[in-house]
Amino acid sequence: AIDYDEDEDGRPKVHVDAR
């Protein structure tokens, strides 16, 4: 699953969860 989150600076960061 691919989720988009915001960093402390408000930057769009993507973390990939491999199931």
From Swiss-Prot:
Cellular component terms (Gene Ontology): extracellular region
Protein's UniProt keywords contain Disulfide bond: yes
Transcription regulation keyword on record: no
Highest taxon of the lineage: Eukaryota
Residues with the Sulfotyrosine modification: 4
Modification note: Conversion of fibrinogen to fibrin is triggered by thrombin, which cleaves fibrinopeptides A and B from alpha and beta chains, and thus exposes the N-terminal polymerization sites responsible for the formation of the soft clot.
Keyword field: Adaptive immunity, Blood coagulation, Coiled coil, Disulfide bond, Hemostasis, Immunity, Innate immunity, Secreted, Sulfation
An individual GO BP term: innate immune response
Comment on protein domains: A long coiled coil structure formed by 3 polypeptide chains connects the central nodule to the C-terminal domains (distal nodules). The long C-terminal ends of the alpha chains fold back, contributing a fourth strand to the coiled coil structure.
Subunit structure: Heterohexamer; disulfide linked. Contains 2 sets of 3 non-identical chains (alpha, beta and gamma). The 2 heterotrimers are in head to head conformation with the N-termini in a small central domain.
Protein purpose: Cleaved by the protease thrombin to yield monomers which, together with fibrinogen alpha (FGA) and fibrinogen gamma (FGG), polymerize to form an insoluble fibrin matrix. Fibrin has a major function in hemostasis as one of the primary components of blood clots. In addition, functions during the early stages of wound repair to stabilize the lesion and guide cell migration during re-epithelialization. Was originally thought to be essential for platelet aggregation, based on in vitro studies using anticoagulated blood.
Name of the featured protein: Fibrinogen beta chain
